[in-house]
Design a protein with these regions (language model features):
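Structured, hydrophobic secondary-structure cores that serve as assembly/anchoring elements
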Residues: 1, 39-58, 66-247
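Extended assembly-interface regions of large multimeric machines
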Residues: 1-16
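Generic secondary-structure boundary signal with a strong preference for alpha-helix termini
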Residues: 13-14, 25, 29-30, 149, ...
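A short acidic, often aromatic-flanked loop/helix-cap motif at beta-alpha or helix-coil junctions
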Residues: 13-17, 80-83
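Phosphate/oxyanion-binding active-site loops and adjacent basic polyanion-contact surfaces
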Residues: 16-28, 241, 245
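Structured alpha-helical segments in the cores of large, soluble enzyme domains
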Residues: 23-38, 55
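Aromatic/hydrophobic pocket-lining residues that form π-stacking "cages" and hydrophobic walls in ligand
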Residues: 62
């Protein structure tokens, strides 16, 4: 599907770990410029930061920014060569938590194939890339799939034009990664797909554990806020009541 509004920012990944850095402030200002408004019709719905942010503290900092601006943030865990290494690194990272803002962050695992190696260029390995951008593209296609439906599974989570993933994950390994809050990229039946709708939130609220539910609630909240702003300061009369009811 066509993306009508997208902003690309070239930032230094290391700078994103500093709350007060110029790059961090630039991203924050861009989000707030369209959310801290009476009219929310042009606000952002997603923030994509490809690759791993480095540690749980930085991930949480950006999750709070996403939460405050009602956007779903998509990012990735570090590239790992095998499942054992990936699981051990996820356990050590301790990314999950019960803070509500973690419900606004989606993290993929298992890098996807960007392109095959070029023998003419003397390359020895295929190029694998973070999956967050591809997943965001799948999620943005709301003409085909409503936001209440997660971009996950064989039918809705297949990534277009992606020809593979680094690790060939077994069912038990997929389940283990889902339990750790990340979204595994799975290559199966000639397709590569996202196989979870989880966020990094693992608290008692089931709604915050699934990004599709968070997206719906954030969207409804912004619609109501925009509507109320449109009718602010109006004297309540039968005519106004009738107009609002018709709207």
């Amino acid at each position: 599907g066509k993306v009508d509004c997208i902003t690309l920012m070239n930032v230094n990944k290391e700078e994103l770990g500093d709350h007060d850095s110029e790059d961090t402030q630039a991203v924050r200002d861009e989000l707030e410029r369209y959310f801290d408004r009476l009219n929310l019709k042009n606000n952002y719905s997603m923030l994509v930061v490809p690759g791993y942010l480095g540690d749980a503290e930085t991930v949480r900092m950006w999750a709070q920014t996403a939460y405050r601006n009602k956007v779903i943030m998509l990012t990735d865990f570090k590239d790992s060569m095998n499942f054992e290494m990936l699981k051990e690194e996820l356990d050590d990272a301790s990314l999950q938590g019960t803070d509500p803002y973690l419900g606004n962050i989606v993290m993929t695992a298992n890098y996807i194939l960007g392109r095959k190696k070029s023998e003419l260029a003397g390359e020895d390995e295929d190029l694998y890339i973070p999956a967050s951008g591809a997943l965001a593209g799948r999620m943005s296609n709301t003409e085909e799939t409503v936001i209440a439906q997660a971009a996950a599974g064989k039918r809705y989570g297949t990534l277009d034009n992606v020809k593979g993933a680094r690790m060939d994950l077994r069912k038990s390994e997929i389940a283990a990664l889902i339990d750790l809050g990340v979204i595994p990229m799975v290559e199966e039946d000639g397709r590569t797909m996202a196989f979870s709708n989880h966020t990094l939130y693992n608290g008692a609220s089931k709604g915050l554990q699934e990004y599709s539910i968070v997206r719906v609630f954030d969207w409804i909240g912004k619609v109501f806020e925009n509507y109320c702003n449109d009718h602010a300061m109006e004297i309540w009369t039968p005519a106004i009541k009738s107009e609002i009811t018709q709207d």
